[in-house]
Amino acid sequence: MAERPLDVIHRSLDKDVLVILKKGFEFRGRLIGYDIHLNVVLADAEMIQDGEVVKRYGKIVIRGDNVLAISPTEE
């Protein structure tokens, strides 16, 4: 049976992910929550620009309609 997108996201819970937003922003952090609208909650979040950390956050919520992609990071 084919994998569904939410299955991949669910397996990424409590793991580091990269979230790419429509306007080109990128955030990396530990995925601690999500919903069917792809609203995501990241802990230890960092804003990434040109491969470099430009700002560190604690816990953030990213609204799903801004999300272009969510990618599990390499372990």
Curated annotation (Swiss-Prot):
Q: Translocase among the record's keywords?
A: no
The record's annotation in Gene3D superfamilies points to:
2.30.30.100
Which keywords fit this entry according to its UniProt record?
A: Ribonucleoprotein
Pfam families referenced in this protein's UniProt entry, alphabetically: LSM
Instruction: Report the GO molecular function annotations.
Output: RNA binding
Q: Which InterPro entries match?
A: Lsm6/sSmF, LSM_dom_sf, Sm, Sm_dom_euk/arc, snRNP_Sm-like_arc
Q: Which SUPFAM superfamilies match?
A: Sm-like ribonucleoproteins
Domain (Sm) spans 4-75
User: What GO terms fall under cellular component here?
Assistant: ribonucleoprotein complex; Sm-like protein family complex
Q: Which GO terms describe its biological process?
A: mRNA splicing, via spliceosome
Entry similarity comment:
Belongs to the snRNP Sm proteins family.
Protein name as annotated: Putative snRNP Sm-like protein
Q: Which organism is it from?
A: Pyrococcus abyssi (strain GE5 / Orsay)
